[in-house]
Amino acid sequence: MLSVRTPLATIADQQQLQLSPLKRLTLADKENTPPTLSSTRVLASKAARRIFQDSAELESKAPTNPSVEDEPLLRENPRRFVVFPIEYHDIWQMYKKAEASFWTAEEVDLSKDIQHWEALKPDERHFISHVLAFFAASDGIVNENLVERFSQEVQVTEARCFYGFQIAMENIHSEMYSLLIDTYIKDPKEREYLFNAIETMPCVKKKADWALRWIGDKEATYGERVVAFAAVEGIFFSGSFASIFWLKKRGLMPGLTFSNELISRDEGLHCDFACLMFKHLVHKPAEQRVREIITNAVRIEQEFLTEALPVKLIGMNCTLMKQYIEFVADRLMLELGFNKIFRVENPFDFMENISLEGKTNFFEKRVGEYQRMGVMSNSTENSFTLDADF
């Protein structure tokens, strides 16, 4: 004869069960409902144990985003406060390359630009001033994204170093564009209008709103936002850069065109870095999603430079400008590891030389490819020894 067991569920146990995962179970499913706990016996069946186990596992996983945990770039990194040892050498090299390219707005000579500015046609002055207004505002938007999102999300030290330096360079770009506006535009009201381009110019506002939406989008993945801001720096800037290089081809505005060389080189590096970060992602957005983001950016940039602020104002062909923007988008798609979308050729031969190393005499002016002495060199390259053979 079996002895009577004491109940497994005491009053304390029943109070504990108020917090148990079982409270979340619906009793409508009779097949999976465990026996009543108020009886003198509890059947320790596999089904009952599995219900407790599965619920506990779900509860422990709830606070963690699997996509973040699966991404080495975004995963919590307790060693992020120390630079060495370097783990991502390719990312670190990009940082050192950016560091070697440092420059300041004071190094650009604008003394000859005033005479050229006054000789320009009204349409040309209108175009240049509006492009500068867009640039002055857009660098601030890029920085907003770096400060508010990317620098906080990315846990890899080498990447955080790059983002920190990029923030400094974007500040210098914004200062340079503001200085150009301040130098060329003498009317205080017009100057104020240009400095507030995001609010005063619908064509600039449209581009700014597109970028700002990505900063505030809490649903978009880091990968999608990296593509979006690669499009901002690679596509939204491309047509405007080309239009200023067109002025250089005509021998106009040496200060403006030289600063454009420096800034376009920096933005090219920032875009390359975005592509590098994209390649390091484990879970990348699908190609169709990337194509959607890129084509949206292309459409907005084409509208900006062929309708809202047409490049024909400075004598450029709007159709060729559309093609050039598509060419730049295709190049970005290849950098991201995908197929071309538009499959067009570069219509501007003068833009082919932008990536080539300049041969400018350093003592005449700093070349656009300038890098700070010794930054990219190995320590052994600058050492002095007495062991040479004579």
Swiss-Prot record:
Localization per record: Cytoplasm; Nucleus
* UniProt cofactor(s): Fe cation
**Gene responsible for this protein:** Rrm2
Q: Which reaction does it catalyse?
A: a 2'-deoxyribonucleoside 5'-diphosphate + [thioredoxin]-disulfide + H2O = a ribonucleoside 5'-diphosphate + [thioredoxin]-dithiol
Highest taxon in the source lineage: Eukaryota
Q: Coordinates of motif Cy in the sequence?
A: 49-51
Post-translational modification (record): Phosphorylation on Ser-20 relieves the inhibitory effect on Wnt signaling. Phosphorylated on Thr-33 by CDK1 and CDK2; predominantly in G2 and M phase.
Which Pfam families does the protein's record reference? Ribonuc_red_sm
Question: This chain belongs to which protein, by name?
Answer: Ribonucleoside-diphosphate reductase subunit M2
Look up the further comments and give them. Two distinct regulatory sites have been defined: the specificity site, which controls substrate specificity, and the activity site which regulates overall catalytic activity. A substrate-binding catalytic site, located on M1, is formed only in the presence of the second subunit M2.
